[in-house]
């Protein structure tokens, strides 16, 4: 947290909005993981203002998804449903790499709402999109979320297959924290 927090002023001075977004999102996520949901909520406003000032509207979708992730941690079903209905990207249309974070949050929402098959289908679509371009961290996360959906759907064979793929990627690239955070 200290490293991320210390980097933010440097990134602001360089006006690198994309890297600043990542640093602020990491700080936000650390607050969530540490159970500081109330402290994290006003942080979204600060991130949104910085994005708008920097003219990087393409980051809005990821920021909206980050807000939804806070709602997932806080159990705010009303906010989750609103995000799914009005802000989440539509996976039935063409998938966009820039919305990857939002798609991954959408899978988590599907899992929470008991829509296991929708979670599996979206995970598979994402895997087909990111596997050819070697986005291994996203791939690992997709396999893990797919394994979770298979578990919920009581499909033990596919659960083991998906989990093994996630574990293999985690081992190869050191993504242990990614799996542990879920």
What are these regions (language model features)?
Residues 84, 105-107, 111-116, 120-123, ...:
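Extracellular beta-rich repeat passengers
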Residues 1, 11-26, 38-39, 51-67, ...:
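Alpha-solenoid helical repeat architecture
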Residues 73-79, 117-118:
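Short, charge-rich, low-complexity alpha-helical interaction segments
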Residues 146, 150-166, 171-182:
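Strand-loop-strand
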Residues 3-7, 40-47, 80-87, 119, ...:
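Tetratricopeptide repeat
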